[in-house]
C-alpha cells in the first residue's frame, strides 16, 4: 500500500507534471539515461505533483540531520583556523556541482546525479579518512567487523534518519550512494558512475588547493608530469579532467576517463598520500585522532547505556558504530574531553 502524505489538492500543473517530465526526458535525455519514472522505493509512495522522485530524494537528503552535520566534519585538515578550508559539506557540494556538469553534457539525468552526490558521504565518520580507518580498526579488533563509509552512508538513509524510519529513497539513489567508493561494486546507473569518478576528481584537486593554502605544499612541490598534462592551477585541472570525462565517456558509452588523464590523476593521488595525507608532519595529529576514536569506542562498548537509542533493536557493535560515525569532529572532541579530563569542583 502506498504511503500517503498530506498534500494540497492537485491542480492542473500537478496533474500533468509526470506526463510532461516523461515527454521532456524522452526527447532531451540520452537513451542511456535513467528515467525519472518509474523509480521504485522500498515502501511505495504516491508521486508528488511538482517534483520528480529523484528531486524528492534530493530534498529529503538536504533536510536530513546527517547532511547538516557534514559542515562540522573534516575533509583533510582537522579544525583548521582559516575560514576557507573545505569541510565534508563543501566537498559534497563540489562533487555534486561537477557531477551535474558532466551529466548535462552527456544528456543524463541531472536530478539523479544531484541526489546521489548530495547523499554520498552522509555516513562518513568524524576526522576524515583517518577517523574512518581508526573506527574500522576498532570494530575489527573487538567484533571482527569492518567499517566502510559508503556502506554506512546507505545505512544512514535506510535506517538512521527519521528516528529509525529512514528516508525511503529510490533504488537508483541508494545504489549510487552505496557504489560511490572505489572499494564498492560499480553503480548500475551511469549517473551513479559519474559521482563515483567525479568524487575522486574533486577531492584530489581540492585537497591540493587546501594544502597549498595551509602552507603544507608549495606550487613548486607539485609533480611536473601530471601538472603538464592537467594544468598548473586547480581550476585548469578540474576543467581538463571534466572535459576529458565527458569526451571519453561519450566515445565509450560508459563513464570513463582517458588513460593519460587517469594516469595523471593517479600520480597526483600518490603524491598527496606521500606528502600530505600520510606525511610525517601529519602523523602526530593522526595518532591523536586514533587515540580519541579508540577511547570513545572502548568507553561506549563498556557503557552502552550512554548511547542514545538510535535503532533500539541493533546489537552492541552496531549501536556504538552508529553513534561514533554520526559524530561531528567538535562533538567527538567535546565528548572525549568530558570523559577524560577532570572537572573543576564547585567552590563552597
PLM regions: where:
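A glycine- and small-aliphatic-rich helix-loop capping segment at beta-alpha/alpha-beta transitions
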Residues: 128-141
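Active-site alpha-helix of zinc metalloproteases
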Residues: 115-116
Amino acid at each position: 500500500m502506498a504511503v500517503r502524505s498530506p498534500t494540497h489538492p492537485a491542480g492542473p500543473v500537478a496533474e500533468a507534471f509526470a506526463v510532461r517530465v516523461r515527454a521532456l526526458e524522452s526527447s532531451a535525455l540520452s537513451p542511456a539515461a535513467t528515467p525519472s519514472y518509474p523509480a521504485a522505493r522500498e515502501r511505495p509512495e504516491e508521486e508528488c505533483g511538482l517534483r520528480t522522485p529523484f528531486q524528492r530524494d534530493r530534498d529529503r537528503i538536504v533536510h536530513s540531520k546527517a547532511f547538516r552535520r557534514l559542515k562540522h566534519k573534516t575533509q583533510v585538515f582537522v579544525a583548521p583556523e582559516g575560514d576557507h578550508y573545505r569541510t565534508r559539506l563543501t566537498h559534497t557540494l563540489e562533487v555534486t556541482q561537477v557531477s551535474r556538469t558532466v551529466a548535462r553534457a552527456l544528456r543524463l539525468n541531472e536530478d539523479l546525479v544531484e541526489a546521489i552526490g548530495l547523499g554520498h558521504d552522509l555516513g562518513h565518520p568524524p576526522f576524515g579518512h583517518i577517523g574512518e580507518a581508526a573506527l574500522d580498526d576498532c570494530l575489527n579488533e573487538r567484533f571482527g567487523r569492518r567499517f566502510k563509509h559508503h556502506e554506512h552512508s546507505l545505512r544512514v538513509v535506510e535506517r538512521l534518519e527519521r528516528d529509525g524510519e529512514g528516508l525511503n529513497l529510490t533504488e537508483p539513489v541508494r545504489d549510487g550512494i552505496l557504489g560511490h567508493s572505489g572499494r564498492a561494486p560499480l553503480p548500475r546507473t551511469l549517473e551513479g558512475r559519474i559521482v563515483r569518478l567525479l568524487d575522486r576528481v574533486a577531492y584530489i584537486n581540492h585537497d591540493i588547493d587546501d594544502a597549498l593554502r595551509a602552507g603544507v605544499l608549495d606550487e613548486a612541490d607539485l609533480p611536473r608530469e601530471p601538472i603538464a598534462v592537467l594544468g598548473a592551477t586547480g581550476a585548469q585541472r578540474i576543467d581538463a579532467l571534466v572535459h576529458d570525462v565527458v569526451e571519453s565517456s561519450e566515445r565509450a558509452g560508459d563513464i570513463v576517463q582517458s588513460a593519460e588523464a587517469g594516469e595523471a590523476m593517479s600520480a597526483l593521488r600518490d603524491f598527496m598520500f606521500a606528502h600530505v595525507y600520510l606525511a610525517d608532519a601529519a602523523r602526530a595529529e593522526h595518532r591523536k585522532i586514533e587515540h580519541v576514536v579508540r577511547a570513545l569506542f572502548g568507553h561506549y562498548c563498556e557503557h552502552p547505556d550512554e548511547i542514545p537509542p538510535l535503532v533500539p533493536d541493533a546489537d552492541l557493535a552496531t549501536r556504538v558504530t552508529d553513534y561514533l560515525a554520526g559524530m561531528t569532529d567538535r562533538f567527538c572532541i567535546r565528548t572525549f574531553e568530558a570523559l577524560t579530563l577532570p572537572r573543576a569542583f564547585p567552590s563552597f
